[in-house]
Protein backbone atom coordinates (compact mmCIF):
# COMPACT_ATOMS: atom_id res chain seq x y z
CA UNK A 1 0.00 0.00 0.00
CA UNK A 2 1.29 3.46 -0.90
CA UNK A 3 0.07 6.93 0.08
CA UNK A 4 1.89 9.68 -1.80
CA UNK A 5 1.36 13.43 -1.35
CA UNK A 6 3.23 15.91 -3.54
CA UNK A 7 3.31 19.70 -3.12
CA UNK A 8 4.57 22.19 -5.69
CA UNK A 9 5.14 25.87 -4.84
CA UNK A 10 5.14 28.83 -7.22
CA UNK A 11 7.92 30.40 -5.13
CA UNK A 12 10.50 28.81 -2.82
CA UNK A 13 9.28 28.07 0.70
CA UNK A 14 11.75 28.88 3.46
CA UNK A 15 10.46 26.69 6.31
CA UNK A 16 7.98 23.81 6.64
CA UNK A 17 6.81 21.96 9.76
CA UNK A 18 4.72 18.80 9.30
CA UNK A 19 2.92 16.29 11.53
CA UNK A 20 1.94 12.99 9.91
CA UNK A 21 -0.62 10.31 10.75
CA UNK A 22 0.55 7.87 8.07
CA UNK A 23 1.81 4.89 10.08
CA UNK A 24 -0.60 1.97 9.71
CA UNK A 25 -0.99 0.27 13.13
CA UNK A 26 -1.17 -3.39 14.04
CA UNK A 27 -4.62 -4.09 15.50
CA UNK A 28 -6.89 -7.07 16.18
CA UNK A 29 -7.97 -7.02 12.50
CA UNK A 30 -4.69 -6.22 10.73
CA UNK A 31 -0.95 -6.70 11.14
CA UNK A 32 1.83 -4.60 9.64
CA UNK A 33 4.77 -6.50 8.16
CA UNK A 34 6.71 -3.52 6.81
CA UNK A 35 6.55 0.29 6.80
CA UNK A 36 8.68 2.97 5.16
CA UNK A 37 8.36 6.75 5.17
CA UNK A 38 10.28 8.92 2.72
CA UNK A 39 10.34 12.70 2.43
CA UNK A 40 11.87 14.74 -0.40
CA UNK A 41 13.77 16.97 0.09
CA UNK A 42 15.21 14.90 2.89
CA UNK A 43 14.85 16.49 6.35
CA UNK A 44 17.65 16.34 8.88
CA UNK A 45 15.55 14.06 11.06
CA UNK A 46 12.09 12.50 11.36
CA UNK A 47 10.85 12.07 14.92
CA UNK A 48 8.29 9.40 15.82
CA UNK A 49 6.04 9.39 18.88
CA UNK A 50 2.70 8.01 20.08
CA UNK A 51 -0.14 10.49 20.42
CA UNK A 52 -2.79 10.65 23.15
CA UNK A 53 -5.07 8.19 21.33
CA UNK A 54 -2.35 5.61 20.73
CA UNK A 55 -1.63 6.49 17.11
CA UNK A 56 1.97 6.67 15.94
CA UNK A 57 2.79 10.08 14.45
CA UNK A 58 5.87 11.49 12.73
CA UNK A 59 7.21 15.03 12.80
CA UNK A 60 9.78 16.67 10.55
CA UNK A 61 10.89 20.16 9.56
CA UNK A 62 12.50 21.56 6.42
CA UNK A 63 14.61 24.65 7.11
CA UNK A 64 16.19 25.17 3.68
CA UNK A 65 14.49 26.86 0.70
CA UNK A 66 12.52 24.33 -1.36
CA UNK A 67 10.13 24.56 -4.31
CA UNK A 68 8.19 21.41 -3.51
CA UNK A 69 7.85 18.48 -1.14
CA UNK A 70 6.84 14.84 -1.55
CA UNK A 71 5.79 12.57 1.32
CA UNK A 72 5.43 8.84 0.62
CA UNK A 73 4.29 6.21 3.12
CA UNK A 74 4.54 2.57 2.03
CA UNK A 75 3.17 -0.32 4.08
CA UNK A 76 2.76 -4.06 3.78
CA UNK A 77 -0.35 -5.09 5.71
CA UNK A 78 -2.10 -8.40 6.35
CA UNK A 79 -5.83 -7.87 6.88
CA UNK A 80 -7.70 -10.62 8.69
CA UNK A 81 -11.15 -11.82 7.68
CA UNK A 82 -13.49 -10.61 10.44
CA UNK A 83 -15.37 -13.15 12.51
CA UNK A 84 -19.14 -12.77 12.02
CA UNK A 85 -20.85 -11.20 15.02
CA UNK A 86 -23.90 -13.23 16.04
CA UNK A 87 -24.76 -11.61 19.38
CA UNK A 88 -24.09 -8.30 21.07
CA UNK A 89 -25.32 -6.43 24.16
CA UNK A 90 -28.31 -4.15 23.85
CA UNK A 91 -27.50 -0.52 23.27
CA UNK A 92 -29.33 0.39 26.52
CA UNK A 93 -26.93 -1.79 28.53
CA UNK A 94 -23.96 0.07 27.10
CA UNK A 95 -25.58 3.49 27.51
CA UNK A 96 -26.29 2.66 31.16
CA UNK A 97 -22.64 1.72 31.72
CA UNK A 98 -21.63 5.02 30.16
CA UNK A 99 -23.87 6.96 32.53
CA UNK A 100 -22.44 5.10 35.52
CA UNK A 101 -18.90 6.03 34.45
CA UNK A 102 -17.83 2.39 34.52
CA UNK A 103 -16.21 2.55 31.10
CA UNK A 104 -12.41 2.92 31.24
CA UNK A 105 -11.14 6.40 30.39
CA UNK A 106 -9.89 5.34 26.95
CA UNK A 107 -13.50 4.46 26.08
CA UNK A 108 -15.36 7.12 28.08
CA UNK A 109 -13.54 9.98 26.34
CA UNK A 110 -15.45 9.15 23.15
CA UNK A 111 -18.82 9.84 24.78
CA UNK A 112 -18.42 13.59 24.68
CA UNK A 113 -18.71 16.32 22.04
CA UNK A 114 -15.58 17.27 20.13
CA UNK A 115 -14.58 20.26 18.05
CA UNK A 116 -16.29 19.08 14.86
CA UNK A 117 -19.06 16.99 16.44
CA UNK A 118 -21.09 19.09 18.84
CA UNK A 119 -24.36 18.29 20.62
CA UNK A 120 -27.13 18.49 18.02
CA UNK A 121 -30.76 17.64 18.93
CA UNK A 122 -31.45 16.85 15.28
CA UNK A 123 -28.88 14.03 15.39
CA UNK A 124 -30.41 12.69 18.59
CA UNK A 125 -33.77 12.46 16.84
CA UNK A 126 -32.16 11.03 13.72
CA UNK A 127 -30.69 8.10 15.64
CA UNK A 128 -33.76 7.21 17.68
CA UNK A 129 -35.45 5.19 14.93
CA UNK A 130 -32.49 2.79 14.87
CA UNK A 131 -32.04 2.58 18.64
CA UNK A 132 -35.32 1.02 19.62
CA UNK A 133 -35.98 -0.77 22.89
CA UNK A 134 -33.77 -3.78 23.72
CA UNK A 135 -32.09 -3.76 20.33
CA UNK A 136 -28.59 -5.27 20.06
CA UNK A 137 -25.98 -2.56 19.59
CA UNK A 138 -24.47 -4.06 16.41
CA UNK A 139 -27.89 -4.37 14.78
CA UNK A 140 -28.82 -0.81 15.73
CA UNK A 141 -25.50 0.62 14.53
CA UNK A 142 -25.88 -1.20 11.22
CA UNK A 143 -29.33 0.31 10.72
CA UNK A 144 -27.89 3.76 11.45
CA UNK A 145 -25.20 3.04 8.85
CA UNK A 146 -27.85 2.13 6.29
CA UNK A 147 -29.89 5.24 7.07
CA UNK A 148 -26.91 7.52 6.48
CA UNK A 149 -26.10 5.68 3.26
CA UNK A 150 -29.70 6.09 2.08
CA UNK A 151 -30.37 9.64 3.27
CA UNK A 152 -27.08 11.31 2.35
CA UNK A 153 -25.67 11.82 -1.13
CA UNK A 154 -21.94 11.48 -1.79
CA UNK A 155 -20.76 14.73 -3.37
CA UNK A 156 -17.08 15.62 -3.32
CA UNK A 157 -17.87 19.24 -4.20
CA UNK A 158 -20.45 19.80 -1.46
CA UNK A 159 -18.13 20.19 1.54
CA UNK A 160 -14.54 20.73 2.65
CA UNK A 161 -12.73 20.15 5.92
CA UNK A 162 -14.09 23.42 7.30
CA UNK A 163 -17.79 22.73 6.55
CA UNK A 164 -19.74 22.64 9.86
CA UNK A 165 -21.60 19.43 10.65
CA UNK A 166 -24.80 21.46 10.96
CA UNK A 167 -24.54 22.35 7.27
CA UNK A 168 -23.85 18.74 6.30
CA UNK A 169 -26.96 17.61 8.18
CA UNK A 170 -29.04 20.36 6.61
CA UNK A 171 -28.04 19.74 2.99
CA UNK A 172 -27.49 15.96 3.32
CA UNK A 173 -24.58 16.01 0.90
CA UNK A 174 -20.95 15.32 1.69
CA UNK A 175 -18.08 12.84 1.70
CA UNK A 176 -16.92 9.96 3.89
CA UNK A 177 -15.55 12.31 6.55
CA UNK A 178 -18.95 14.00 6.87
CA UNK A 179 -20.89 10.73 7.00
CA UNK A 180 -18.59 9.43 9.74
CA UNK A 181 -19.20 12.62 11.74
CA UNK A 182 -22.98 12.22 11.33
CA UNK A 183 -22.84 8.65 12.62
CA UNK A 184 -20.63 9.56 15.57
CA UNK A 185 -22.90 12.46 16.52
CA UNK A 186 -25.98 10.23 16.42
CA UNK A 187 -24.29 7.51 18.50
CA UNK A 188 -22.97 9.89 21.15
CA UNK A 189 -26.44 11.43 21.38
CA UNK A 190 -27.71 8.00 22.51
CA UNK A 191 -25.01 7.84 25.20
CA UNK A 192 -22.74 5.47 23.24
CA UNK A 193 -18.95 5.83 22.85
CA UNK A 194 -18.11 6.44 19.19
CA UNK A 195 -14.88 7.42 17.49
CA UNK A 196 -13.65 8.55 14.08
CA UNK A 197 -11.45 6.18 12.07
CA UNK A 198 -9.26 7.21 9.15
CA UNK A 199 -7.91 4.64 6.74
CA UNK A 200 -7.91 3.32 3.22
CA UNK A 201 -10.33 1.45 1.00
CA UNK A 202 -9.26 -0.93 -1.73
CA UNK A 203 -11.35 -0.54 -4.86
CA UNK A 204 -11.99 -2.88 -7.78
CA UNK A 205 -11.88 -1.81 -11.44
CA UNK A 206 -14.95 -2.19 -13.67
CA UNK A 207 -15.26 -5.61 -15.37
CA UNK A 208 -12.78 -5.94 -18.21
CA UNK A 209 -10.82 -2.84 -17.22
CA UNK A 210 -7.21 -2.81 -15.92
CA UNK A 211 -6.56 -1.82 -12.36
CA UNK A 212 -5.24 1.76 -12.18
CA UNK A 213 -2.31 2.41 -9.89
CA UNK A 214 -3.23 5.22 -7.51
CA UNK A 215 -6.98 4.80 -7.96
CA UNK A 216 -7.75 3.72 -4.40
CA UNK A 217 -8.93 6.11 -1.76
CA UNK A 218 -8.21 7.64 1.60
CA UNK A 219 -11.32 6.85 3.57
CA UNK A 220 -13.09 7.38 6.89
CA UNK A 221 -15.76 5.63 8.92
CA UNK A 222 -16.99 5.38 12.51
CA UNK A 223 -16.46 2.88 15.29
CA UNK A 224 -18.75 2.17 18.24
CA UNK A 225 -17.79 0.46 21.49
CA UNK A 226 -19.84 -2.74 21.81
CA UNK A 227 -18.79 -3.95 25.25
CA UNK A 228 -15.69 -5.58 26.68
CA UNK A 229 -16.14 -8.83 24.74
CA UNK A 230 -16.57 -7.33 21.26
CA UNK A 231 -14.65 -4.10 21.82
CA UNK A 232 -14.76 -1.53 19.03
CA UNK A 233 -16.77 -2.47 15.94
CA UNK A 234 -16.39 -0.41 12.75
CA UNK A 235 -19.10 0.66 10.29
CA UNK A 236 -18.71 2.35 6.90
CA UNK A 237 -21.77 4.53 6.14
CA UNK A 238 -20.36 5.66 2.79
CA UNK A 239 -20.64 2.09 1.48
CA UNK A 240 -23.31 0.69 3.83
CA UNK A 241 -21.13 -2.10 5.21
CA UNK A 242 -19.40 -3.26 8.33
CA UNK A 243 -15.67 -2.76 7.84
CA UNK A 244 -14.05 -5.79 6.19
CA UNK A 245 -10.95 -6.95 4.38
CA UNK A 246 -10.97 -4.08 1.87
CA UNK A 247 -10.56 -1.55 4.69
CA UNK A 248 -7.21 -0.70 6.26
CA UNK A 249 -7.23 1.29 9.50
CA UNK A 250 -4.78 4.17 9.80
CA UNK A 251 -5.69 6.10 12.98
CA UNK A 252 -8.57 6.93 15.31
CA UNK A 253 -9.64 9.97 17.29
CA UNK A 254 -12.61 12.07 18.37
CA UNK A 255 -13.11 13.49 14.88
CA UNK A 256 -11.22 14.28 11.68
CA UNK A 257 -8.97 16.91 13.22
CA UNK A 258 -7.33 14.41 15.60
CA UNK A 259 -6.13 12.18 12.77
CA UNK A 260 -5.67 14.31 9.65
CA UNK A 261 -3.05 12.44 7.56
CA UNK A 262 -0.85 15.51 7.10
CA UNK A 263 -0.93 18.72 9.13
CA UNK A 264 1.61 21.44 8.60
CA UNK A 265 2.73 25.03 8.37
CA UNK A 266 4.69 26.46 5.44
CA UNK A 267 6.38 29.86 5.36
CA UNK A 268 6.57 31.38 1.89
CA UNK A 269 5.97 29.30 -1.19
CA UNK A 270 3.44 31.60 -2.85
CA UNK A 271 0.66 29.60 -4.46
CA UNK A 272 0.84 25.85 -3.99
CA UNK A 273 -0.65 22.82 -5.70
CA UNK A 274 -1.19 19.49 -3.95
CA UNK A 275 -1.60 16.07 -5.54
CA UNK A 276 -2.51 12.94 -3.58
CA UNK A 277 -2.39 9.36 -4.82
CA UNK A 278 -3.38 6.24 -2.87
CA UNK A 279 -2.78 2.68 -4.01
CA UNK A 280 -3.89 -0.45 -2.14
CA UNK A 281 -2.78 -3.52 -4.06
CA UNK A 282 -2.91 -7.23 -3.17
CA UNK A 283 0.58 -8.71 -3.27
CA UNK A 284 -0.36 -11.17 -6.02
CA UNK A 285 -1.52 -8.26 -8.22
CA UNK A 286 1.72 -6.28 -8.11
CA UNK A 287 3.16 -7.99 -11.15
CA UNK A 288 0.09 -7.97 -13.39
CA UNK A 289 -3.32 -6.45 -14.02
CA UNK A 290 -2.33 -2.85 -13.34
CA UNK A 291 -1.73 0.25 -15.38
CA UNK A 292 1.22 2.16 -13.92
CA UNK A 293 1.33 5.91 -14.07
CA UNK A 294 -2.42 6.31 -14.48
CA UNK A 295 -4.09 9.38 -13.11
CA UNK A 296 -5.53 8.70 -9.67
CA UNK A 297 -9.23 9.20 -9.10
CA UNK A 298 -8.22 10.33 -5.63
CA UNK A 299 -5.76 12.96 -6.86
CA UNK A 300 -6.62 16.46 -5.88
CA UNK A 301 -5.56 19.83 -7.20
CA UNK A 302 -5.55 22.39 -4.44
CA UNK A 303 -4.35 25.95 -4.64
CA UNK A 304 -3.97 28.23 -1.68
CA UNK A 305 -2.14 31.43 -0.89
CA UNK A 306 0.35 31.21 1.98
CA UNK A 307 0.63 34.16 4.29
Where are these regions (language model features)?
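Glycine-rich, small/acidic residue-mixed loop/short-helix segments
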Residues: 20-26, 30, 35-37, 239-260, ...
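A broadly conserved detector of short glycine/acidic/proline-rich loop/turn motifs that flank catalytic sites
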Residues: 26, 43, 75-77, 200, ...
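Secondary-structure boundary elements
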Residues: 93-174, 182, 254-256, 280-286
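Hydrophobic/aromatic-rich core segments of domains that either
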Residues: 146, 152, 178-270
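Hydrophobic/aromatic scaffold residues of ePK-like serine/threonine protein kinase catalytic domains
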Residues: 275-277
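Catalytic-core signal marking the mid-to-C-terminal active-site face
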Residues: 288-290, 305
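A mobile, often basic/glycine-rich helix-loop segment
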Residues: 293-295
